[in-house]
């Protein structure tokens, strides 16, 4: 920093002056591929440093969820993802480590530890109303069979019996269809 408040950056045979300088060296949220060099340099120069936080990063499973959902790696689908008052309607992607894709990466910029992230896997459908209608139209059809018309087959097979009781839709109570 210069005493007058600006900066001079020396580049080989040239000096470039400016009122402000931006130091960027990658994302600290990915320690295996990033560096805190820019932050250390800025602090070393006595500059004010905006506190860093992860952004545009995937969400990772805890051990129990990793075991339950690892086989869904590669499954993607459109979803509405929300946290607090912010929401995005973008694709999400199941990975071997967690959830990624445009929707999850965007909402990560608004998420703080302890916040709840809500994911609507059927954002363009009132799932409850659709299932109630199917109680008359397709009463003998299993819930998992119906859901495979709207969601990836591998996802439905994985969560059947965990998120919902797989039974004939005509036998399901309205309460059991709200999940």
List PLM regions with ranges.
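A conserved short coil-to-beta-strand element within the FAD-binding core of flavoproteins
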Residues: 1-6
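Short, solvent-exposed secondary-structure boundary motifs
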Residues: 8-10, 98
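Core beta-strand elements of the Rossmann-like FAD/NAD(P) dinucleotide-binding domain
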Residues: 10-20, 87-90
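Glycine-rich loop(s) and the adjacent beta-strand/alpha-helix scaffold that form part
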Residues: 20-66
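An anion/pyrophosphate-binding glycine-rich loop and adjacent beta-alpha core
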Residues: 47-51, 57-178
């Amino acid at each position: 920093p210069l005493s007058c408040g600006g900066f001079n950056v020396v580049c080989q045979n040239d000096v470039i002056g400016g009122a402000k300088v931006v130091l960027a060296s990658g994302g600290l949220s990915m320690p295996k591929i990033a560096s805190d060099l820019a932050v250390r340099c800025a602090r070393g120069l006595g500059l004010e440093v905006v506190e860093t936080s992860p952004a545009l990063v995937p969400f990772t499973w805890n051990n129990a969820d990793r075991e339950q959902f690892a086989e869904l790696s590669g499954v993607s689908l459109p979803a509405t993802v929300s946290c607090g008052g912010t929401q995005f309607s973008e694709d999400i992607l199941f990975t071997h480590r967690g959830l990624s894709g445009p929707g999850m990466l965007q909402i990560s910029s608004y998420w703080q530890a302890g916040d709840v992230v809500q994911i609507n896997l059927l954002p363009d459908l009132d799932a409850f109303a659709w299932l109630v209608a199917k109680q008359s139209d397709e009463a003998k059809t299993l819930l998992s069979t119906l859901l495979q018309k709207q969601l990836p087959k591998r996802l439905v097979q994985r969560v059947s019996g965990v998120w919902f009781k797989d039974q004939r839709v005509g036998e399901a109570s309205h309460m059991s269809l709200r999940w």
